[in-house]
């Protein structure tokens, strides 16, 4: 509801003036009409004020790619000229390979970018108090890149509950991310 308010418009003007992005979070379940409407309002607002969009999307170990599918549908109805970045995108890895390839092609056609957050997602996803996770979803970096989707690796947490080991050290982030995501 916030994105429909006068406050949101004022915020978008301030963000645009500072060169920033508008953002939000889409986690499963996200197929409701309310989510669709709010996402479309956010996209229109960002485009009207020339602000990029950064969505934390599909940071989940279930509901494969529900947020991304919703975003792509919204972008068909509300095409934008501003960059749209999708942070996390972990649950995309739960898709069968052929479905992931088709989705990645659609993402590339929509000119989406992805920021993978492997350390945060390894810490949070598939967490259980009484068991070590046997599978942890990660953004499918190589598959997305192969389809033409730009992907960056980053960290979005510094010594907080979402990743207590975060310390703003990009070399440590890269050193841990390479084996975790098998980038080499």
Residue ranges and their predicted role:
Residues 33, 63-64, 124-125, 162-163:
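Short secondary-structure boundary/hinge segments and terminal tails
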Residues 73-84, 120, 124, 135-184:
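His/Asp/Glu-enriched, well-ordered alpha-helical/loop segment
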Residues 87-90, 118-128:
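Short, basic, glycine/proline-bearing loop/turn elements
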């Amino acid at each position: 509801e916030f994105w429909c308010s006068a406050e949101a418009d004022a915020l978008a003007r301030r963000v645009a003036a500072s060169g920033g992005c508008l953002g939000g979070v889409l986690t499963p379940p996200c197929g409701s009409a309310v989510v669709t409407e709010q996402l479309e309002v956010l996209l229109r607002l960002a485009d009207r004020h020339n602000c990029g969009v950064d969505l934390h999307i599909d940071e989940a170990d279930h509901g494969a790619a529900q947020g991304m599918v919703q975003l792509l549908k919204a972008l068909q109805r509300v095409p934008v000229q501003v960059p749209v970045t999708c942070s996390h995108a972990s649950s995309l890895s739960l898709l069968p390979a052929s479905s992931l390839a088709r989705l990645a092609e659609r993402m590339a056609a929509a000119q989406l970018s992805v920021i993978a957050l492997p350390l945060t997602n390894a810490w949070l996803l598939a967490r259980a108090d009484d068991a070590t996770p046997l599978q942890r979803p990660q953004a499918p970096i190589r598959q997305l890149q192969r389809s033409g989707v730009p992907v960056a690796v980053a960290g979005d947490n510094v010594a907080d509950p979402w990743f207590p080991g975060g310390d703003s050290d990009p070399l440590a982030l890269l050193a841990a991310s390479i084996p975790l995501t098998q980038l080499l």
